[in-house]
């Protein structure tokens, strides 16, 4: 009886330690992490107040400067950023120029701006932004899968067509 129990235990142990058992667990975990990130992005996009040029115009005219995170940019930097925005037909931000954001703003200020478009996950790609407070450090330290599907150094020039351009991000919705 005891020998049967030991043999059964050892066979279960051998199966539990097999490479197949280990290789499937990280795969499941990574899929769960990716799925969670994609759900977060969908929620952010749905809640974003700006999904088109019309939304942007409406936001700019109805939001007081004191409540508008875009007001943190210099007038020239704001204009370059706004002119660079590309939206797709699904109401998603598909690409933008981030050079002025990175040069003029802190990490949390960039996060607030990108939240207007449901694209706050791209903040982690702007590695030269200033870190000046606890919020900046928290955002910088947060894990992100921003690089998955978003291409730093490329601009969205047409549907599903990214072109190599410094200080631009071509997003998965291009």
Regions found by a protein language model. Give the residues of each.
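Generic detector of short, well-ordered, non-transmembrane alpha-helical segments enriched
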Residues: 17-19, 158
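Secreted, short cysteine-rich peptides and small extracellular cysteine-rich domains stabilized by multiple disulfide
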Residues: 147-174
């Amino acid at each position: 009886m005891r020998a049967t129990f030991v043999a059964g235990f050892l066979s279960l142990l051998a199966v539990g330690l097999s490479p197949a058992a280990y290789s499937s667990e990280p795969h499941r975990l990574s899929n769960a992490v990716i799925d969670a990130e994609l759900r977060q992005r969908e929620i952010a996009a749905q809640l974003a107040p700006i999904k088109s040029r019309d939304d942007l115009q409406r936001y700019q005219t109805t939001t007081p400067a004191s409540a508008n995170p875009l007001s943190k940019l210099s007038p020239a930097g704001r204009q370059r950023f706004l002119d660079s925005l590309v939206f797709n037909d699904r109401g998603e931000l598909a690409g933008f120029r981030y050079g002025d954001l990175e040069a003029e703003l802190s990490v949390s200020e960039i996060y607030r701006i990108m939240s207007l478009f449901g694209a706050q996950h791209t903040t982690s790609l702007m590695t030269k932004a200033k870190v000046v407070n606890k919020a900046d450090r928290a955002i910088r330290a947060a894990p992100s899968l921003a690089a998955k599907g978003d291409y730093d150094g490329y601009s969205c020039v047409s549907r599903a067509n990214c072109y190599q351009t410094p200080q631009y991000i071509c997003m998965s919705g291009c």
